[in-house]
């Protein structure tokens, strides 16, 4: 499915345990409609030792968030994203105030 969000956009989390937090999109899974937001939805992952000399580790990792639970965040405003044509180029803009992204 086509989305209007891109890697590097600042978004705000709308639902879940990290509601209200903002962060930058690290990756987008367009097939499963998930996004990974930097420093949001952190989970603990256990890395098993491969050899007897190594120790197991527990690391914090960002888990994906459903794309419907995030919204573009710019200048303190959350807004939906629209597309308009200027000089035969597609431009993304915030629908709430008309500002270009």
Swiss-Prot record:
InterPro entries: KOW (IPR005824), Rib_uL2_dom2 (IPR014722), Ribosomal_uL24 (IPR003256), Ribosomal_uL24_CS (IPR005825), Ribosomal_uL24_KOW (IPR041988), Translation_prot_SH3-like_sf (IPR008991). It comes from the Bacteria. SUPFAM superfamilies: Translation proteins SH3-like domain (SSF50104). Pfam families: KOW, ribosomal_L24. Disulfide bonds: none annotated. Keywords: Ribonucleoprotein, Ribosomal protein, RNA-binding, rRNA-binding. One of its GO terms (cellular component) is ribonucleoprotein complex. GO terms for molecular function: rRNA binding; structural constituent of ribosome. Part of the 50S ribosomal subunit. Belongs to the universal ribosomal protein uL24 family. This is Large ribosomal subunit protein uL24. It comes from Borrelia hermsii (strain HS1 / DAH). The gene is rplX.
């Amino acid at each position: 499915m086509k989305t209007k969000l891109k890697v590097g956009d600042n978004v705000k989390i709308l639902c879940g345990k990290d509601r209200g937090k903002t962060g930058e999109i690290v990756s987008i899974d367009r097939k499963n409609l998930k996004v990974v937001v930097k420093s949001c939805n952190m989970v603990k992952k256990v890395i098993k030792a491969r050899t007897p000399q190594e120790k197991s580790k527990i690391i914090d990792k960002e888990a994906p968030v459903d794309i419907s639970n995030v919204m573009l965040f710019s200048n303190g405003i959350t807004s939906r994203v629209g597309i308009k044509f200027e000089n035969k180029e597609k431009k993304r803009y915030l629908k709430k105030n008309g500002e270009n992204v």
